[in-house]
Amino acid sequence: MISVGIDVSKGKSTVCILKPYGEIVSKPFNITHTQKDLSELSSMLFRLNDEVKIVMEATGIYHLPVLTYLQEKGFFVSVVNPYLMKSYRNESLRKAKTDKIDSRIIANYGIDHWFKMKEFQTSGEIYEELKLLGQQYRHYMKLHLLSLAELTHLLDLTMPGIKNLLASWNETNRKDKRSDFVERFWHYDVITSMSEQEFTEEYILWAKEKKYVPSQEKAKVIYALAQESIPTLPSETSSIKMLVTEAVRVLKEVDATLGLILSRMQEIAKTLPEYSVVREMGGVGNTLAPKLIAEIGDVRRFRNGKALVAFAGIDPPPYESGQFVGCNRKISKRGSASLRKVGYETMRSLKMRSRPEDPVYRYVVKKESEGKSKKSAKIAGLNKFLRIYYARVTELYKNI
């Protein structure tokens, strides 16, 4: 019975090996994440000729090389949630923290939780690829929001009010009418330099070219706004056209990347057996289906629906003391924030498209009728949605 505690950091780790009752097999020592050092570590563990369990704390991506190598060598490896390890570490009165101390604490955790520890299970290449794509999608969405904010700021100076007339990027059809329009008509002075009839004709030609609705009424509204508005920066300012067109170009490049990633996610997700089941659930469309699967991963790794709900961090923790029993508890938020976000988008989509036959929709409506806020009702609906998701997908895999 030997516990190997590994405190992982970027590019290197500190290893401590213990037996029960604090018997030290090997004092803490450092290794780098290279084939040579990891090979020497695995050879050392094989020579111990005893049952070995390796424990490490989840550290984003830094622990993955060590985890992958040791699992390929056949070792039992448990990856512990950082919050659990923090709680265990806080049991000590002394608050000293070094890599050597941390590795010893992790090794002690392995001894104390020897029979409760679970071996880390990989989710499969498809789920891992979807997860990576989902992470990159969120990254580029942040860039999209930043780029959109910069363009909006410039438009407030050159074309105030235009953002209320033209829609921005649509995640479903991946078209951005506002950016397309500003790329062609980058300042109100460009519009007012023409007569209303000339601008209307130009707008109709532009709309047909970009495959938008060629509405004369819309053109007249835009022209009237251009005449009435007061741009802060005149078009004669030498840098204005360059700044506006560059802001549009950057935004479009980010949006194109988002479109490529989402297309790849849809392509991969459609190869999974559960895709059709997830796609048929209320509120889930072609965009949200791959996102949900990417965030949840292989649902078979959860022991029941409650575990999936806890993974999302929307489980209200019980609280009671003496005669008091807490009823109106808030969600824990100790889980995947990205899954909560995608799940909330799903509930919004479900509520917008009334589906009285859907059990989750009826549940959300019921909670709202009981006096719950719309947000609380949607979170309650998400709780029910994830339980149904778990039941349907696991049932599917049982029958395969």
Regions found by a protein language model. Name each.
Residues 1-400:
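A detector of single, family-specific signature residues
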